[in-house]
């Protein structure tokens, strides 16, 4: 009873398995990361996100 809901990164289907039953792609945690005001890596995450937006 320790299974958690997972979401396929490719086709956005929810499953309890490690891989998607439709496409076989790996599934991950559908929840966003926890927010903490004392986020030690927030600066680096924002820089990375900014770089991704510039290349898109």
UniProtKB/Swiss-Prot annotation:
Q: Which InterPro entries match?
A: H/ACA_rnp_Nop10, H/ACA_rnp_Nop10_sf, Nop10_arc-typ
Task: Tell me which SUPFAM superfamilies the record gives.
Answer: Nop10-like SnoRNP
Q: What is this protein called?
A: Ribosome biogenesis protein Nop10
* Cysteine disulfide partners in this protein: none
Provide the alphabetized UniProt keywords.
Ribonucleoprotein, Ribosome biogenesis, rRNA processing
Instruction: Note the superkingdom of the native organism.
Output: Archaea
A single Gene Ontology CC term: ribonucleoprotein complex
Q: Name one GO biological process term.
A: pseudouridine synthesis
Q: Which organism is it from?
A: Methanococcoides burtonii (strain DSM 6242 / NBRC 107633 / OCM 468 / ACE-M)
Single GO molecular-function term?
snoRNA binding
Q: Name one Pfam family in it.
A: Nop10p
Function noted in UniProt: Involved in ribosome biogenesis; more specifically in 18S rRNA pseudouridylation and in cleavage of pre-rRNA.
């Amino acid at each position: 009873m320790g299974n958690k809901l997972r979401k396929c990164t490719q086709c956005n289907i929810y499953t309890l398995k490690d891989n998607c039953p439709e496409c076989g792609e790996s599934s991950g945690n559908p929840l966003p990361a926890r927010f903490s005001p004392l986020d030690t890596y927030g600066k680096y995450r924002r820089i990375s996100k900014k770089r991704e937006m510039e290349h898109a």
